[in-house]
UniProtKB/Swiss-Prot annotation:
Keywords: Acetylation, Cell projection, Endosome, Lipid-binding, Membrane, Phosphoprotein, Protein transport, Transport. The modification Phosphoserine is found at residues 97, 117, 119, 185, 277. This is Sorting nexin-2. Pfam families: PX, Sorting_nexin, Vps5. Residues 1-104 are annotated as: Disordered. One of its GO terms (biological process) is retrograde transport, endosome to Golgi. The lineage of its organism: Eukaryota, Metazoa, Chordata, Craniata, Vertebrata. It comes from Homo sapiens (Human). Belongs to the sorting nexin family. Residues 140-269 form the PX domain. It is found in: Early endosome membrane; Cell projection, Lamellipodium. Residues 27-50, 93-104 have a biased composition (Low complexity). SUPFAM superfamilies: BAR/IMD domain-like, PX domain.
Length: 519
């Protein structure tokens, strides 16, 4: 019966080409996968590294027939046990985890598996990654700041250099606190290196801030005015957020290029990062070619999860863009309100100076002072609208583009696998024709080619399964971070609005006696 079933096999343990990139990502995995079969053995078993769901494209795995009395693994998850419980030992891996400073809880809630029939059971598998994430928490003891923008050089050869300061207790770094000077092209070069390593295997690489030819040209050839200062501050804040998101990723944090960027006093000059260059034009051509290929590839998606997520991100992208436009309009209106308030304050002050009535003149002068203070409040609120809300939306519009990029790479991986299968079929047909035509001298060559393409088909299948598995984990981590970021920003934004309104009330309450004193 169900209680006497043996645990599922642990797999043959064959490594794939991508498993070396999986190290360190366990801390941030929050995707929960639904099992098709769950034995009621007292010891939970880990899934094989290359296990795929029944909805995955390609050859289907052998189905397991379940008894009707399926158990709800979380039906009575009420018992608290120590982390040293023997029931956890088969799940936890002995492999070394990334050097982080974890926060380890003293107790952990463990579900008890009871032989209890449920009318509508929901069975979940708690993977090794999720157990470790729950035990260790999403904490990386590393703080990164970008500050002190400095103009280096003159004319069109000038550029902005930024100080990147890192504070950490992670053992992978040589010091606990260090700072380096980096220019904007260095940030672009870092993103290019990380994307070339990890994007095509399913990792979501945070995008770097976009180049602005107009804004940087003003900084290079123009004098230091308010617009140039505002542009430099926007870029500094964007670069800081980019690095903070990058080091939050457990796999990217361990990349040697990232550590070199943070620690090395001198970096090789980043090349092919200019917008108006041969490499820049080539990138635009490649993007256009990828868009055309995406339209021509017709992937038979049989995994409902991927189909649902792609539609979800398409809708989310559209709504975020609409909200971003609205918030930018709000920022513009707030700045206009600030300018009009300043003009009103100036006019009220001039009227107060020309007024003969002493009490009325004093009241008008006080009104002008209040309006000047309100003008400052409007400027601060416009600043909060932009840096708290608008920039968050802008970042996530680019992040969702990166998410859709990994889905596109999965489609390319499937297309490569499909092409290998078609080529293998043609090779087998050619071999059959040779055997019918009795050409023994070419049959051996055909057999060798068939073996070669069979290996390519198997490798393509493994690559596709691995990138699908990685994307599931990455999307789960992305969703968790997205909710956390929006919650934090919305709370801060509402607090700024409340503070602004409270300050307005104080200003008007202080002015009210002056208005009543007019006689």
């Amino acid at each position: 019966m169900a209680a006497e079933r043996e645990p599922p096999p642990l797999g043959d343990g064959k490594p794939t080409d991508f498993e070396d990139l999986e190290d360190g990502e366990d801390l941030f995995t929050s995707t929960v996968s639904t099992l098709e079969s769950s034995p009621s053995s007292p010891e939970p078993a880990s899934l094989p590294a290359e296990d795929i769901s029944a909805n995955s494209n390609g050859p289907k795995p052998t189905e397991v027939v379940l008894d009707d009395d399926r158990e709800d693994l979380f039906a009575e998850a009420t018992e608290e046990v120590s982390l040293d419980s023997p029931e956890r030992e088969p799940i936890l891996s002995s492999e070394p985890s990334p050097a982080v400073t974890p926060v380890t809880p003293t107790t952990l809630i463990a579900p008890r598996i009871e032989s209890k029939s449920m009318s509508a059971p929901v069975i979940f598998d708690r993977s090794r990654e999720e157990i470790e994430e729950e035990a260790n928490g999403d904490i990386f003891d590393i703080e990164i700041g970008v500050s002190d923008p400095e103009k280096v050089g003159d004319g069109m050869n000038a550029y902005m250099a930024y100080r990147v300061t890192t504070k950490t207790s992670l053992s992978m770094f040589s010091k606990s606190e260090f700072s380096v000077k980096r220019r904007f092209s260095d940030f672009l070069g870092l993103h290019s290196k990380l994307a070339s390593k990890y994007l095509h295997v399913g990792y979501i690489v945070p995008p770097a801030p976009e180049k602005s030819i107009v804004g940087m040209t003003k900084v290079k050839v123009g004098k230091e005015d308010s617009s140039s200062t505002e542009f430099v501050e926007k870029r500094r804040a964007a670069l800081e957020r980019y690095l903070q998101r990058t080091v939050k990723h457990p796999t990217l944090l361990q990349d040697p290029d990232l550590r070199q960027f943070l620690e090395s006093s001198e970096l090789p000059r980043a090349v092919n990062t200019q917008a108006l260059s041969g490499a820049g034009i080539l990138r635009m051509v490649n993007k256009a070619a990828d868009a055309v290929n995406k339209m021509t590839i017709k992937m038979n998606e049989s995994d409902a999860w991927f189909e649902e997520k792609q539609q979800q991100f398409e809708n989310l992208d559209q709504q975020l863009r609409k909200l971003h436009v609205s918030v930018e309009a709000l920022v513009c209106h707030r700045k206009e309100l600030s300018a009009n308030t300043a003009a009103f304050a100036k006019s009220a002050a001039m009227l107060g100076n020309s007024e003969d009535h002493t009490a009325l003149s004093r009241a008008l002068s006080q009104l002008a002072e209040v309006e000047e203070k309100i003008d400052q409040l409007h400027q601060e609120q416009a600043f909060a609208d932009f840096y708290m809300f608008s920039e968050l939306l802008s970042d996530y519009i680019r992040l969702i583009a990166a998410v859709k990029g990994v889905f596109d790479h999965r489609m390319k991986c499937w297309q490569k696998w499909e092409d290998a299968q078609i080529t293998l079929l043609k090779k087998r047909e050619a071999e059959a024709k040779m055997m019918v035509a009795n050409k023994p001298d070419k049959i051996q060559q055909a057999k060798n080619e068939i073996r070669e393409w069979e290996a390519k088909v198997q490798q393509g299948e493994r690559d596709f399964e691995q990138i699908s598995k990685t994307i599931r984990k990455e999307v789960g981590r992305f969703e968790k971070e997205r909710v956390k970021d929006f919650k934090t920003v919305i709370i801060k934004y509402l607090e700024s609005l409340v503070q602004t309104q409270q300050q307005l009330i104080k200003y008007w309450e202080a002015f009210l006696p002056e208005a009543k004193a007019i006689a």
